[in-house]
From Swiss-Prot:
Signal peptide bounds: 1-18
Record keywords: Cell outer membrane, Chaperone, Lipoprotein, Membrane, Palmitate, Protein transport, Signal, Transport
InterPro entries: LolA/LolB/LppX, OM_lipoprot_LolB
Organism encoding this protein: Tolumonas auensis (strain DSM 9187 / NBRC 110442 / TA 4)
Mode of membrane association: Lipid-anchor
Function according to Swiss-Prot or TrEMBL: Plays a critical role in the incorporation of lipoproteins in the outer membrane after they are released by the LolA protein.
GO-annotated biological processes: lipoprotein localization to outer membrane; protein transport
UniProt xrefs under NCBIfam families: lolB
Compartments where found: Cell outer membrane
Subunit structure: Monomer.
Protein name: Outer-membrane lipoprotein LolB
Protein backbone atom coordinates (compact mmCIF):
# COMPACT_ATOMS: atom_id res chain seq x y z
CA UNK A 1 0.00 0.00 0.00
CA UNK A 2 2.80 2.38 0.95
CA UNK A 3 4.52 1.63 -2.34
CA UNK A 4 1.37 2.55 -4.25
CA UNK A 5 1.10 5.85 -2.33
CA UNK A 6 4.77 6.66 -3.04
CA UNK A 7 4.35 5.88 -6.73
CA UNK A 8 1.20 8.03 -6.89
CA UNK A 9 3.02 10.89 -5.15
CA UNK A 10 6.01 10.60 -7.50
CA UNK A 11 3.70 10.48 -10.53
CA UNK A 12 1.86 13.63 -9.35
CA UNK A 13 5.16 15.43 -8.72
CA UNK A 14 6.40 14.51 -12.19
CA UNK A 15 3.23 15.86 -13.77
CA UNK A 16 3.46 19.10 -11.76
CA UNK A 17 7.13 19.49 -12.68
CA UNK A 18 6.37 18.88 -16.36
CA UNK A 19 3.55 21.42 -16.29
CA UNK A 20 5.63 24.09 -14.57
CA UNK A 21 8.65 23.62 -16.83
CA UNK A 22 6.62 23.62 -20.05
CA UNK A 23 7.70 26.51 -22.24
CA UNK A 24 5.19 29.24 -22.75
CA UNK A 25 4.07 29.51 -26.35
CA UNK A 26 4.50 32.99 -27.79
CA UNK A 27 1.39 35.12 -27.96
CA UNK A 28 0.23 34.73 -31.54
CA UNK A 29 -2.08 37.74 -31.34
CA UNK A 30 0.64 39.95 -32.86
CA UNK A 31 1.18 37.47 -35.69
CA UNK A 32 -2.54 37.16 -36.44
CA UNK A 33 -2.86 40.94 -36.61
CA UNK A 34 0.26 41.29 -38.78
CA UNK A 35 -0.88 38.50 -41.11
CA UNK A 36 -4.35 40.01 -41.55
CA UNK A 37 -2.84 43.40 -42.36
CA UNK A 38 -0.39 41.93 -44.87
CA UNK A 39 -3.05 39.83 -46.58
CA UNK A 40 -5.09 42.99 -47.13
CA UNK A 41 -2.18 44.63 -49.01
CA UNK A 42 -2.75 43.69 -52.66
CA UNK A 43 -1.33 46.79 -54.38
CA UNK A 44 2.23 47.78 -53.53
CA UNK A 45 5.57 48.79 -55.00
CA UNK A 46 9.09 48.08 -53.76
CA UNK A 47 12.42 49.50 -54.88
CA UNK A 48 15.81 48.24 -53.81
CA UNK A 49 18.73 46.01 -54.69
CA UNK A 50 18.79 42.33 -55.49
CA UNK A 51 21.92 40.18 -55.38
CA UNK A 52 21.70 36.97 -57.40
CA UNK A 53 24.21 34.23 -56.60
CA UNK A 54 24.48 30.97 -58.53
CA UNK A 55 27.35 28.46 -58.71
CA UNK A 56 28.40 30.03 -62.03
CA UNK A 57 27.68 33.74 -61.51
CA UNK A 58 27.26 36.51 -59.01
CA UNK A 59 25.52 39.75 -59.81
CA UNK A 60 23.64 42.66 -58.39
CA UNK A 61 20.75 44.59 -59.90
CA UNK A 62 18.29 47.27 -58.93
CA UNK A 63 14.77 45.99 -58.52
CA UNK A 64 11.42 47.68 -58.85
CA UNK A 65 8.38 45.47 -58.34
CA UNK A 66 4.87 46.83 -58.72
CA UNK A 67 2.09 44.49 -57.60
CA UNK A 68 -1.53 45.16 -58.61
CA UNK A 69 -3.66 42.34 -57.25
CA UNK A 70 -2.55 39.20 -59.10
CA UNK A 71 -0.77 41.19 -61.83
CA UNK A 72 2.73 42.62 -61.53
CA UNK A 73 5.46 44.53 -63.30
CA UNK A 74 9.04 43.61 -62.35
CA UNK A 75 11.93 45.69 -63.61
CA UNK A 76 15.57 44.69 -63.05
CA UNK A 77 18.21 47.20 -64.09
CA UNK A 78 21.97 47.36 -63.77
CA UNK A 79 23.48 49.70 -61.23
CA UNK A 80 24.01 52.09 -64.17
CA UNK A 81 20.29 51.97 -65.03
CA UNK A 82 20.28 49.79 -68.15
CA UNK A 83 17.61 47.09 -68.42
CA UNK A 84 18.66 43.60 -67.39
CA UNK A 85 15.17 42.13 -67.53
CA UNK A 86 11.58 43.34 -67.42
CA UNK A 87 8.69 41.04 -66.65
CA UNK A 88 4.96 41.77 -66.74
CA UNK A 89 2.11 39.51 -65.72
CA UNK A 90 -1.36 40.41 -66.89
CA UNK A 91 -3.98 37.75 -66.27
CA UNK A 92 -2.34 34.45 -67.21
CA UNK A 93 0.05 36.00 -69.75
CA UNK A 94 3.72 36.60 -68.89
CA UNK A 95 5.91 38.88 -71.01
CA UNK A 96 9.65 39.10 -70.40
CA UNK A 97 11.85 41.62 -72.19
CA UNK A 98 15.58 40.92 -72.02
CA UNK A 99 18.50 43.35 -72.08
CA UNK A 100 18.47 43.41 -75.90
CA UNK A 101 14.76 44.30 -76.10
CA UNK A 102 13.72 40.81 -77.23
CA UNK A 103 10.24 39.79 -75.99
CA UNK A 104 9.39 36.33 -74.70
CA UNK A 105 5.84 35.24 -73.92
CA UNK A 106 4.34 32.39 -72.00
CA UNK A 107 2.27 31.40 -69.01
CA UNK A 108 5.02 29.98 -66.74
CA UNK A 109 7.15 32.81 -65.33
CA UNK A 110 9.59 30.55 -63.48
CA UNK A 111 10.31 28.53 -66.62
CA UNK A 112 10.79 31.67 -68.75
CA UNK A 113 13.16 33.25 -66.21
CA UNK A 114 15.20 30.06 -65.94
CA UNK A 115 15.32 29.57 -69.71
CA UNK A 116 16.50 33.13 -70.32
CA UNK A 117 18.84 33.67 -67.37
CA UNK A 118 19.60 30.33 -65.76
CA UNK A 119 18.27 31.76 -62.48
CA UNK A 120 15.89 29.68 -60.43
CA UNK A 121 13.47 32.22 -58.98
CA UNK A 122 10.27 31.38 -57.07
CA UNK A 123 8.34 33.98 -59.08
CA UNK A 124 4.86 32.73 -58.12
CA UNK A 125 5.52 32.90 -54.38
CA UNK A 126 7.63 36.08 -54.36
CA UNK A 127 4.74 38.56 -53.98
CA UNK A 128 3.62 36.76 -50.83
CA UNK A 129 7.11 36.13 -49.44
CA UNK A 130 8.30 39.69 -50.10
CA UNK A 131 5.52 40.90 -47.80
CA UNK A 132 6.51 38.37 -45.12
CA UNK A 133 3.60 35.97 -45.60
CA UNK A 134 4.49 32.26 -45.42
CA UNK A 135 1.37 30.84 -47.04
CA UNK A 136 0.96 27.17 -46.12
CA UNK A 137 4.67 26.53 -45.43
CA UNK A 138 6.72 26.18 -42.23
CA UNK A 139 7.64 29.48 -40.62
CA UNK A 140 8.92 31.13 -37.45
CA UNK A 141 7.84 34.44 -35.99
CA UNK A 142 9.37 36.86 -33.51
CA UNK A 143 7.54 38.31 -30.47
CA UNK A 144 6.43 41.28 -32.59
CA UNK A 145 4.46 38.98 -34.89
CA UNK A 146 6.88 39.25 -37.80
CA UNK A 147 8.08 36.28 -39.80
CA UNK A 148 11.78 35.58 -39.30
CA UNK A 149 12.04 32.41 -41.38
CA UNK A 150 10.06 30.50 -44.00
CA UNK A 151 10.97 26.99 -45.21
CA UNK A 152 9.71 25.04 -48.19
CA UNK A 153 11.11 21.95 -49.88
CA UNK A 154 13.03 24.12 -52.38
CA UNK A 155 13.53 27.48 -50.61
CA UNK A 156 14.48 28.89 -47.24
CA UNK A 157 13.89 32.57 -46.47
CA UNK A 158 15.49 34.58 -43.67
CA UNK A 159 13.98 37.94 -42.74
CA UNK A 160 16.80 39.91 -41.12
CA UNK A 161 15.15 43.31 -40.61
CA UNK A 162 11.83 45.11 -40.92
CA UNK A 163 11.11 48.79 -41.54
CA UNK A 164 8.17 51.02 -40.62
CA UNK A 165 5.98 51.96 -43.60
CA UNK A 166 2.85 54.06 -43.06
CA UNK A 167 2.21 52.46 -39.66
CA UNK A 168 3.05 48.95 -40.90
CA UNK A 169 6.19 46.88 -40.37
CA UNK A 170 7.38 45.62 -43.75
CA UNK A 171 10.41 43.44 -44.60
CA UNK A 172 13.63 45.28 -45.40
CA UNK A 173 16.34 42.60 -45.77
CA UNK A 174 15.42 39.11 -46.99
CA UNK A 175 17.64 36.22 -48.08
CA UNK A 176 16.11 33.53 -50.31
CA UNK A 177 18.19 30.32 -50.50
CA UNK A 178 17.37 27.70 -53.11
CA UNK A 179 19.25 24.62 -54.25
CA UNK A 180 21.20 26.44 -56.98
CA UNK A 181 20.32 30.09 -56.43
CA UNK A 182 20.57 32.56 -53.58
CA UNK A 183 18.76 35.90 -53.73
CA UNK A 184 19.50 38.74 -51.32
CA UNK A 185 16.88 41.45 -51.39
CA UNK A 186 17.35 44.84 -49.73
CA UNK A 187 14.21 46.94 -49.96
CA UNK A 188 14.95 50.66 -49.81
CA UNK A 189 11.39 51.82 -50.36
CA UNK A 190 7.88 50.45 -49.93
CA UNK A 191 4.78 52.15 -51.33
CA UNK A 192 1.47 50.73 -50.17
CA UNK A 193 -1.69 51.64 -52.05
CA UNK A 194 -4.39 52.97 -49.78
Amino acid sequence: MKLLQHLTLIFCLLILTACSSRQQQPDNTNWRQQREKLESVTHWTISGKLAIITPEKKGSVRIRWQQNGDDYHLNLTSLLGTRVMEMRKTGEQIVIIDDKGQEYRGTDAEYLVYRLTGWQMPVYKLPMWIKGLPGDTDYQINPNGQVTQIKTAQWQMQYQTYQPVDGWMMPENITFKGQQTELRLVINEWKLAK
